[in-house]
Curated annotation (Swiss-Prot):
GO biological process: acute-phase response
Entry-linked Gene3D superfamilies: Serpins superfamily (2.10.310.10)
Major subcellular site: secreted
Record PROSITE patterns: SERPIN (PS00284)
Name this protein carries in UniProt: Alpha-1-antiproteinase
UniProt entry keywords in alphabetical sequence: Acute phase, Glycoprotein, Phosphoprotein, Protease inhibitor, Secreted, Serine protease inhibitor
One Gene Ontology term, aspect cellular component: extracellular region
Recorded domain comment: The reactive center loop (RCL) extends out from the body of the protein and directs binding to the target protease. The protease cleaves the serpin at the reactive site within the RCL, establishing a covalent linkage between the serpin reactive site and the active site of the protease. The resulting inactive serpin-protease complex is highly stable.
Source species, domain of life: Eukaryota
Localization in the cell: Secreted
MF-aspect GO terms: serine-type endopeptidase inhibitor activity
Species this protein is from: Notamacropus eugenii
Site feature (Reactive bond) residues: M29, S30
Family: Belongs to the serpin family.
Length: 46
């Protein structure tokens, strides 16, 4: 499901675009608070 979020469409936040689909798969796996330094966006975004 792709919601028309202005944040994902922002330019400057193009990084979240990529991360957006990754977060959807990471959210169910991120039930335990795991800090991934390689993907700090997961926390922001979360």
């Amino acid at each position: 499901e792709e919601l028309p979020d202005s944040k994902d469409r922002a330019x400057p936040l193009s990084a979240s675009k990529x991360i957006s689909p990754y977060m959807k798969e990471a959210i169910p796996m991120s039930i335990p608070p795991v800090i991934d330094f390689n993907k700090p966006f997961l926390i922001i975004x979360y």
